[in-house]
Structure formats: structure tokens, C-alpha cells
Amino acid sequence: MKEGIHPNYTEVTVKCLCGNTFQTRSTKPEISTEICSACHPFFTGKQKLIDTAGRVERFKRRYGM
């Protein structure tokens, strides 16, 4: 292997929008994510409501339905 061409692989903190943080290793200095295992519906068993009513109404208006 050549020396000096590989990025540093260090321990970083991953921050989720829900406020959860955890440690992992990466070549990036900081990682942020929208969904993690603490807030993902598959792991929590809770279903999040996604506002699609606006999209459906816009589709109906656009195509005359």
C-alpha cells in the first residue's frame, strides 16, 4: 500500500434530527442523518404520519380529477 494517500479513519459522532447521537468510525469529520434506529418506524413500532394530502390534491387539480 502507498503511504500518505489514504484518508484518516477516525471516530466520529453521528447526529440524528430526533436528537439521538452515537459513535462510529468514518473518514468524514461529522455525520448528520434524518432518521436513525431510535426514531425509525420499523424499530420503534410507531407509524409516522406523512402529509400526502397536499400532494394528492395538487395531482387531482393538475390532471382534472
From Swiss-Prot:
A single GO cellular-component term from the record reads: ribosome
UniProt keyword Ribosomal protein present: yes
Q: Which keywords belong to this entry?
A: Metal-binding, Ribonucleoprotein, Ribosomal protein, RNA-binding, rRNA-binding, Zinc
Per UniProt, Zn(2+) binds at 16, 18, 36, 39
Cofactor binding note of this UniProt entry: Binds 1 zinc ion per subunit.
Name any cofactors this protein relies on.
Zn(2+)
Q: Does the keyword Heme apply?
A: no
A Pfam family it matches? Ribosomal_L31
Q: Which Gene3D superfamilies match?
A: Ribosomal protein L31
Question: What's a BP term from Gene Ontology annotated to this protein?
Answer: translation
PROSITE patterns from the UniProt entry: RIBOSOMAL_L31 (PS01143)
Q: Name one GO molecular function term.
A: rRNA binding
Which protein family is named in the record?
A: Belongs to the bacterial ribosomal protein bL31 family. Type A subfamily.
Self-association or partners: how does it assemble? Part of the 50S ribosomal subunit.
PANTHER family linked: 50S RIBOSOMAL PROTEIN L31, CHLOROPLASTIC (PTHR33280), LARGE RIBOSOMAL SUBUNIT PROTEIN BL31A (PTHR33280:SF6)
Tell me, what does this protein do in biology? Binds the 23S rRNA.
**Descriptive protein name:** Large ribosomal subunit protein bL31
Identify the species of origin. Geotalea uraniireducens (strain Rf4)
